[in-house]
């Protein structure tokens, strides 16, 4: 026992560098632990830790209350592609008969006003002698001098045809236009390629003539008819420039 104490003392002396005043130190065995002390006071709260990651979503909750009211209508969408045409339906029932035209007051009023306007227009144009009314015919000229074929196209484009007098009254009306412009005019008659006689443009035979004495002559060469300023007729080739007079 004393040897152990001596070794410890020498070691302590060498470490501390102290040569004298050494003390004998002896370490004993650990004693029996004492009884635990009473619990101390609670410590203070620590600092807040770092925010953790979000947790997983919770389970689906139960349905809510009653559905809300429908929202307002949205904007109209673009029209879709047209579908195929359906089958033709059955004819509908026949409607009740309408009133006779003579009893339709509105129609009669419209016709009366239209007739009045037409007569007014004709009257105004007649003052300029560019339009003359004889019976159910209307003769008109635009003062142009062109060949026979061009006159045909001009009159047809206006809805009429080359003037062709069929009575002394009609011939006098056409002659008054010829006198006004002081130039000859072609009439709506042509020589038949078969008989050589003159006929109307639709092929019907002529029922009225006012030939200049000794006319017509030059069969086969002069296949059109012109009117002099005195209203008499003469056959002529169709390539001359003559006053265009149309009838409607």
Curated annotation (Swiss-Prot):
Localization of this protein: Secreted; Secreted, Extracellular space, Extracellular matrix; Secreted, Extracellular space, Surface film
SUPFAM superfamilies: C-type lectin-like, Triple coiled coil domain of C-type lectins
GO CC entries: collagen trimer; extracellular space; multivesicular body
Any Pfam family matching the protein: Lectin_C
List of residues that carry 4-hydroxyproline: 30, 33, 36, 42, 54, 57, 63, 67, 70
Boundaries of every Collagen-like domain copy: 28-100
Principal localisation: secreted
Compositional bias of kind Basic and acidic residues: 42-51, 84-93
Composition-biased stretches (Pro residues): 54-65
GO biological process: respiratory gaseous exchange by respiratory system
Domain of life from the UniProt record: Eukaryota
Domain C-type lectin, residue spans: 132-248
Binding-site residues, Ca(2+): 215, 217, 234
The keyword Repeat is annotated on this UniProt entry: yes
Stored InterPro entries: C-type_lectin-like, C-type_lectin-like/link_sf, C-type_lectin_CS, Ca-dependent_lectin, Collectin_CTLD, CTDL_fold
Chain's role: In presence of calcium ions, it binds to surfactant phospholipids and contributes to lower the surface tension at the air-liquid interface in the alveoli of the mammalian lung and is essential for normal respiration. Enhances the expression of MYO18A/SP-R210 on alveolar macrophages.
SUBUNIT field: Oligomeric complex of 6 set of homotrimers.
PANTHER family: PULMONARY SURFACTANT-ASSOCIATED PROTEIN A (PTHR24024), PULMONARY SURFACTANT-ASSOCIATED PROTEIN A1 (PTHR24024:SF13)
Family: Belongs to the SFTPA family.
UniProt miscellaneous comment: Pulmonary surfactant consists of 90% lipid and 10% protein. There are 4 surfactant-associated proteins: 2 collagenous, carbohydrate-binding glycoproteins (SP-A and SP-D) and 2 small hydrophobic proteins (SP-B and SP-C).
UniProt protein name: Pulmonary surfactant-associated protein A
């Amino acid at each position: 026992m004393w040897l152990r104490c001596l070794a410890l003392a020498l070691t302590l002396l060498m470490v501390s560098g102290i040569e004298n005043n050494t003390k004998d130190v002896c370490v004993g065995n650990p004693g029996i632990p004492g009884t635990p002390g009473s619990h101390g006071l609670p410590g203070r709260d620590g600092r807040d830790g770092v925010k953790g990651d979000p947790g997983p979503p919770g389970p689906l909750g139960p349905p809510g209350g009653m559905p809300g009211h429908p929202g307002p209508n949205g904007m109209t969408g673009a029209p879709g592609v047209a579908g195929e045409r359906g089958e033709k339906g059955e004819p509908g029932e026949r409607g009740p008969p309408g009133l006779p035209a003579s009893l339709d007051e509105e129609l009669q009023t419209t016709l009366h006003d239209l007739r009045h306007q037409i007569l007014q227009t004709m009257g105004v144009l007649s003052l300029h002698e560019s339009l003359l009314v004889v019976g159910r015919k209307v003769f008109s000229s635009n003062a142009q001098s062109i060949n026979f074929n061009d006159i045909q196209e001009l009159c047809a484009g206006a809805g009429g045809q080359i003037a062709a007098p069929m009575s002394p009254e009609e011939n006098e009306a056409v002659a008054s236009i010829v006198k006004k412009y002081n130039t000859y005019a072609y009439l709506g008659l042509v020589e038949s390629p078969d008989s050589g006689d003159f006929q109307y443009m639709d092929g019907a035979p002529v029922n009225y003539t006012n030939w200049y004495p000794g006319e017509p002559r030059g069969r086969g060469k002069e296949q059109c008819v012109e009117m002099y300023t005195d209203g008499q007729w003469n056959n002529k080739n169709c390539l001359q420039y003559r006053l265009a007079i149309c009838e409607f």
